[in-house]
Amino acid sequence: MLFFGTTINYLDRIVLGILLPDIRSELHISDQEYSFITAAFQTAYTVGFLFMGSVVDRIGSRLAYGIAALCWSASAGLTVLAHNALQLGIWRAALGLSESCNFPAAIKSVADWFDHKDRASATGVFNSGTNVAAMVGPPIFVYLSQQYGWRACFMVTAGLGILWVIAWLQIHPKKVKAEHKEPQGLSWLEAARLREAWGFALGKFFSDPAWWFYLFWMPLYLHDVRKLDMVTVGWSLLFIYVMAGVGGMVGGWASGRLIRNGWQPLRARKATMLVCACAMPFAALGVLVPSATAAIVLFSLATGFHQAWSANLFTTVSDTVPSKAVGAVTGLGGFAGGVSGIIFSAIIPGYVIPAFGYTPVFLAMGGFYFAGLFAMHELMKRTAAPR
């Protein structure tokens, strides 16, 4: 259920970027207006993290996740009413606010349901929903848009979200054992006093911009710079995010294997993340190669290594903080990642790309991971959370 919830969450998120060439021509949206629309989503998504994590800790993942999914589905459906950039930005902001509950609720569920050695794998599986959405979304959305218009795509994702909420409330137990043991969660201000929370937050701050940039700008890059038609863009994104899904699951398996071989959990996560950090600058060189095919292959490696990084990064929270703080710490990290996403993947590209092209942005994104890993290494030292 976490996998399907995350998949639908990301289908709602990526549909705008995929259909932007069509939406842009109908609503007359410029690159700068698009950058502000993405910033509206990111701002709401970021602000939501400040309280969504605490809400999850206090009322439980079942109820919090269900309400949030219902709200983001409504926001997606109401997007069909947009007739200009401002209206589109408003509905995207509403979507972002409600979608900010997804990862705190999912990580909290993993912490409650799985042992240390299995958490990265479980996180990799549900987080692969982001990649499945990015795989199946482009060809499906392009087809639906060509047959029925772009507004039909938003109605489809809204309907899927409502169906998921019904299933989630039926399947999820009303209360799990960990919620009986620790009914009182922490606020994000209380979570901010934890040293490990800042390690996780800085890890998110330095790695999230790359994912957001690929998510929001990759379709436009392939269409505008590599001169691929919309159908080819859709299939190219399918391959890129297939590799992202594989990377997430392999990354979770790798650290789990190290733990089974006797490594401490946090050391295993950091070792796996170091490999990912070393690979990202190389993968970003896809922007420099003359061949569109080679570029797509390199970008697929970038998304794969990012998701391997992400599967382990998320799991460090349940490895290092008490169960009652997992949602709040995840929310604090999401806030940090959202702030950096607004700055480095929404606003700055809107000015840098028209003036200098995509190259400096791609290259910068590849180098951020080392700073995030260094901060995590210094601030996250405990290898097991007290239970």
Where are these regions (language model features)?
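Cytoplasmic helix-loop-helix junction between adjacent transmembrane helices
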Residues: 91-130
